[in-house]
Structures are given as C-alpha cells and as structure tokens.
C-alpha cells in the first residue's frame, strides 16, 4: 500500500467526521435553545414542542452518522488502494 494514499485516507476520514459533525452540532444547539425559549413562552405547548424537537434532532443526528459512514468507508473500504 502506498503510504501517501494511506495517510491521505486517514486525513480525509478525519475531515469527513469532523466537518460532518460541525453543522449538525450547531443546528442541534440552536434548535434546543429555541425549544427552551418556546417552552418558556408557552408552557402549555410542551408536548408539541418536545415531539417536534426530538424528531428534528434525530434528523440532524443522521447527518453526523452519514459522515461517520463515509469516514469508515474511506478507512476500511478504500477504493484508491
């Protein structure tokens, strides 16, 4: 195996998971903060806000999992080797 390709694959995998987690992390923080603000304004809408928040957090977390899958594919099923 070419050491340059191996090193580039590891760096690419690190970037894939690192950059793939930044956006969802920021989005989850923003969504959680806005949900808390909504609960503070309308406590009677707790169930609806919580359900919507959990669903949106699951979709955001899926993006991070896609980054993990890409990183694992780059490391273990490298098409360049």
UniProtKB/Swiss-Prot annotation:
F(1)F(0) ATP synthase produces ATP from ADP in the presence of a proton or sodium gradient. F-type ATPases consist of two structural domains, F(1) containing the extramembraneous catalytic core and F(0) containing the membrane proton channel, linked together by a central stalk and a peripheral stalk. During catalysis, ATP synthesis in the catalytic domain of F(1) is coupled via a rotary mechanism of the central stalk subunits to proton translocation. It is found in: Plastid, Chloroplast thylakoid membrane. GO terms for molecular function: lipid binding; proton-transporting ATP synthase activity, rotational mechanism. Its main location: plastid. Keywords: ATP synthesis, CF(0), Chloroplast, Hydrogen ion transport, Ion transport, Lipid-binding, Membrane, Plastid, Thylakoid, Transmembrane, Transmembrane helix, Transport. It comes from Euglena gracilis. F-type ATPases have 2 components, F(1) - the catalytic core - and F(0) - the membrane proton channel. F(1) has five subunits: alpha(3), beta(3), gamma(1), delta(1), epsilon(1). F(0) has four main subunits: a(1), b(1), b'(1) and c(10-14). The alpha and beta chains form an alternating ring which encloses part of the gamma chain. F(1) is attached to F(0) by a central stalk formed by the gamma and epsilon chains, while a peripheral stalk is formed by the delta, b and b' chains. HAMAP family: ATP_synth_c_bact (MF_01396). The chain crosses the membrane at residues 3-23, 57-77. NCBIfam families: ATP_synt_c (TIGR01260), PRK07354.1 (NF005608). The gene is atpH. It comes from the Eukaryota. The record marks 61 as: Reversibly protonated during proton transport. This is ATP synthase subunit c, chloroplastic. Belongs to the ATPase C chain family. In plastids the F-type ATPase is also known as CF(1)CF(0). GO terms for cellular component: chloroplast thylakoid membrane; proton-transporting ATP synthase complex; proton-transporting two-sector ATPase complex, proton-transporting domain. It is a multi-pass membrane protein. CDD domains: ATP-synt_Fo_c_ATPH.
């Amino acid at each position: 195996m070419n050491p340059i390709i191996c090193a580039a694959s590891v760096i690419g995998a690190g970037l894939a998971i690192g950059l793939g987690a930044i956006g969802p992390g920021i989005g989850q923080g923003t969504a959680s903060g806005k949900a808390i603000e909504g609960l503070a304004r309308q406590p009677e809408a707790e169930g609806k806000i919580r359900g919507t928040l959990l669903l949106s957090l699951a979709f955001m977390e899926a993006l991070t999992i896609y980054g993990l899958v890409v990183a694992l594919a780059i490391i273990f099923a490298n098409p360049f080797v």
